[in-house]
Regions:
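N-terminal hydrophobic or amphipathic helices/low-complexity stretches enriched
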Residues: 1-7
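Short polar catalytic/cofactor-binding loops
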Residues: 7-13
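Glycine-rich beta-alpha loop elements in corrinoid/cobalamin-binding modules
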Residues: 2, 26, 33-167
Length: 183
């Protein structure tokens, strides 16, 4: 199963003055953890990569991910929802999952406000995202998957929060090797 992580920018396709760019570390750790557990991974960082709708749609068709995990802070939540909307219009079979500070603080409200997100991950994401991807791969029900908000027959359901990871040493280093630092 192929999982693509997308680091969402503040705006899509508009020039924003940036003073520095940082590797999306949390997303890199999530993806490395998935790879460690047998998933094929990729990272699209639209904070540094050029974005056009046409190139994004083509990339969806070429790379054919099963799951896309969006990472967004509050200023970029509308950009994230725009990406989710494009995904649902052009590749509706892809499961769109979102995490990050905005949805972490407002998981249920975010599900109501942004209907194109299939699943919201809140709280510490590593074990939640792994379990979620494993359930989706095996076509298992999401009920009981701690740390998510999802829909059941159109109704928004918030599962219980997941306990914090006790041993952070079990997590791998971020998957920096999947990024082209040349550009």
């Amino acid at each position: 199963m192929k999982v693509i992580g997308i680091s969402c920018p503040l705006t899509l396709g508009k020039h924003v003055q940036i003073t520095s760019i940082h590797f999306p570390l949390s997303l890199g750790v999530l993806l490395a953890y998935l790879r460690k557990n047998g998933f094929e991974i990729g990272l699209w960082d639209y904070n540094v990569e050029e974005f056009t709708e046409a190139s994004f749609i083509q990339r969806l068709k070429t790379e054919k991910p099963d799951i896309i995990g969006l990472a967004a802070m509050t200023p970029g939540i509308k950009s994230a929802h725009k990406l989710a909307t494009l995904i649902k219009e052009h590749a509706p079979q892809i499961t769109v999952i979102i995490g990050g500070p905005h949805v972490d603080a407002l998981p249920v409200q975010s599900a109501k406000e942004f209907p194109k997100f299939d699943i919201i991950v809140y709280g510490e994401a590593e074990d939640t995202f792994l379990e979620l991807c494993q359930r989706l791969e095996k076509k298992k029900a999401l009920k009981g998957c701690q740390g998510i908000v999802h829909r059941v027959k159109g109704k928004i359901v918030q599962e219980l929060p997941r306990p914090l990871i006790k041993d952070l040493d079990k997590l791998p280093y971020a998957a920096r090797d999947i990024v082209n630092f040349e550009n």
